[in-house]
Amino acid sequence: MKFIIKTQKGFENIVVNNLKEIVDDFNYIVSPDGYQGIVIVESDEDIEDKILQIPEVERVLKVYFETETDFDKIVNLAEKIKDYIKEDETFAVETKKRGKHDFSSTDINIVLGAKIKDLTNASVDLNNPDKVVHVEVFKNKTYVSITPGEKFKKYTKEKRNARELFKKVVIVQMPYLGEKIVCKRFGEAIGRAAQGFEVKELIIAPKEKVDAYELMEFIKGVKIGQHSRYEIQKRAYPFEIKLVPVTVQDLYQVVRDKRRDNRLLIITDPKGDELSKIKDKLAYDLRKKREIIVFCGSREGIPRGLFRFADYIVDLAPHMTFATEHAIPAALIALWGVYSGEDLENSSKEEKTESNSNGE
């Protein structure tokens, strides 16, 4: 019986040495084909539970089948895999390919997945599958593991999707201006944050005439940071990701344009209210408004004259100030806490009401 053990790079021998203390007899390969973070273990017994006792182990895949690393032979394993997937179950194929071959991970996912589907009549579900077929491709050998979908699932039906809120959020960011290299660095952080939260739009909004070249460097940084995060998202998510639109508009004109049509204007500033004091009303408005405009300052805060036009002025962390690059993550995480927390409270109230109506 073989197991593929995944660790942080450089921890492979630590795992092996710890395993020797709790398992009497096993064979192992450290960093197969030179790929760090992998240990392949073979034992006469099922030692998965013992392997998981080692803190340095991040993941264990029990090998169900192995074959030579040949596209047709890998796909033909569907004949064996079908016995582990029922017609009324859903499944997904996840391939991790190491090294150069004449096929891609996507090729395996598509063709093997299609053959399993034909053989089982099971449905493919890339988000919440009942079973996951893991295909681990090395230079000469390929291993297949089958796990319950929830075992390593990031996205479960029980978890609210934060995109419910963030897809309605427009970030209005005052640009960081000054030394050009610093402008660019701050721009990168802003671009990464806006793309990371997949907001509806990022508006770069200077409040007055500014140095064109300083602004240009800031915007260059935004683009670099945004695309850097976007490339990671494309690899990490099992669904399509879009680039967040980035525009430039005068700060005061943004306020004029957005003060209508069922929109919510929020300014983050130390002069505002604590979230705990406004969270109930804010949660209601976050749900009802079609668009949420969040204003973030830079070296200077949002001009005080605009406070009159905001629906909320929020102090995210009383007696503390955030660095420019932390404003977007701090604001959005705080708003998500308010938005999702309202659901939990409503759920609790509903459960309590139901219990009372049942005479409990």
From Swiss-Prot:
Highest taxon above the source species: Archaea
SUPFAM superfamilies: alpha/beta knot, THUMP domain-like
Transmembrane segments: none
Domain THUMP: 45-148
GO molecular function: RNA binding; tRNA (guanine) methyltransferase activity
GO BP terms in the entry: tRNA methylation
Pfam families on file: SPOUT_MTase_2, THUMP
Disulfide bonds: none
Name the record gives this protein: Uncharacterized protein MJ0421
